[in-house]
């Protein structure tokens, strides 16, 4: 059995990652693949927390740009993350992996409310904990949720899984063939150069709490495990 480099991780999944190539909605094949990858690392006794975005179903910024009240649009986005989280929980439990969804907005009929100490206890019992509904506050992204929850549960690393890129580049590799991929970066580099890794609030939170971040592609099966056991994949962001 491979020895994991990290004992407790936060896996950040964008909503788009769950949509796969169809671009929106929830792709059952993709979510099953992600669940299998999570099972691989859970079987290494890694404590796994997951933060899921909602962009495959709804984006608060899109609603705001169309004239909606920003807070209302963001709350709709939080509800989208709950739908994604329940879908992921179902896929995990189909594979025999115990999991719990905790929401920042109370909806006790479908999930537990977020309680930090309870989340940590679930992790210690090797249950996968899925954090849904963002931070529970409008104007904050699910990237910031991942940074906040990682700090709260004292995670060793954030694994940021992307579905359309395999790391951080100095330009969009889909538009610029000369784009160069970074192997390592500091959070100050990310903030100073305006690199599209995560928003500035999330980057600052990770930097202040010294939480390393690995950005990699979710589309290649086995990549989550490769990141956890310390193989060099994607881009690692750490320190000042």
UniProtKB/Swiss-Prot annotation:
Its job: Catalyzes the reversible phosphorylation of UMP to UDP.
GO biological process: one example: 'de novo' CTP biosynthetic process
Catalytic activity: UMP + ATP = UDP + ADP
Stored CDD domains: AAK_UMPK-PyrH-Ec
Ligand binding (ATP): 12-15, 55, 59, 163, 169, 172
Binding site residues for UMP: 54, 74, 135-142
Gene3D superfamilies xref list: Acetylglutamate kinase-like (3.40.1160.10)
NCBIfam families named among the record's database cross-references: pyrH_bact (TIGR02075)
Protein localization: Cytoplasm
Subunit structure: Homohexamer.
Source species: Bacillus velezensis (strain DSM 23117 / BGSC 10A6 / LMG 26770 / FZB42) (Bacillus amyloliquefaciens subsp. plantarum)
Pathway the protein acts in: Pyrimidine metabolism; CTP biosynthesis via de novo pathway; UDP from UMP (UMPK route): step 1/1
Regulation: Allosterically activated by GTP. Inhibited by UTP.
Listed name of the protein: Uridylate kinase
